Amino acid sequence: MTDPVTLDGEGTIGEFDEKRAENAVRELLIAVGEDPDREGLRETPGRVARAYREIFAGLWQKPEDVLTTTFDIGHDEMVLVKDIEVLSSCEHHLVPFVGVAHVGYIPSTDGKITGLSKLARLVDVYARRPQVQERLTTQVADSLMEILEPRGVIVVVECEHMCMSMRGVRKPGAKTITSAVRGQLRDPATRNEAMSLIMAR
């Protein structure tokens, strides 16, 4: 499975240091020529630090923690959850990218499935961290394959990146689409079935 972003070899990262984050935001405001002590900005460093704790909460979560509930019901056909909201942050510019994810899988031979909300939570685990869309897509697919052991997985993510909309080429509305396909869903007929379900409105 693609390893999450880590700072050591144990698959974990450091604790969130709110005071250090607050000081860093204050320094950034000074660096861009602002006065962090003026009325409108006086509380901004603290607000941003607390917001980052929430926005990057996925750094302190593991995919297996959200896929703990499974059911053996003998279902052997595709399960697909569409239009899962994606709210993430580009690790290159620390600005948002937003959109939707479609996550589908063919259960294992014993029919083991997970709760539908768990697929949305899995997307959040990987979205709520400094991220790139390509890695996010792969991590969701690989986590499902490793933890649920399904016969196949498909993940399609479609997002607008503020680093393209607000700066650089400045093309609001441009969408990036990434996909990851594993197992039996690599079969053209099965993949086409999944894509037709994803594209149906």
Curated annotation (Swiss-Prot):
Keywords: GTP-binding, Hydrolase, Metal-binding, Nucleotide-binding, One-carbon metabolism, Zinc. It catalyses: GTP + H2O = 7,8-dihydroneopterin 3'-triphosphate + formate + H(+). Pathway: Cofactor biosynthesis; 7,8-dihydroneopterin triphosphate biosynthesis; 7,8-dihydroneopterin triphosphate from GTP: step 1/1. GO terms for cellular component: cytoplasm. It holds the Pfam family GTP_cyclohydroI. Belongs to the GTP cyclohydrolase I family. Toroid-shaped homodecamer, composed of two pentamers of five dimers. This is GTP cyclohydrolase 1. It comes from Streptomyces avermitilis (strain ATCC 31267 / DSM 46492 / JCM 5070 / NBRC 14893 / NCIMB 12804 / NRRL 8165 / MA-4680).
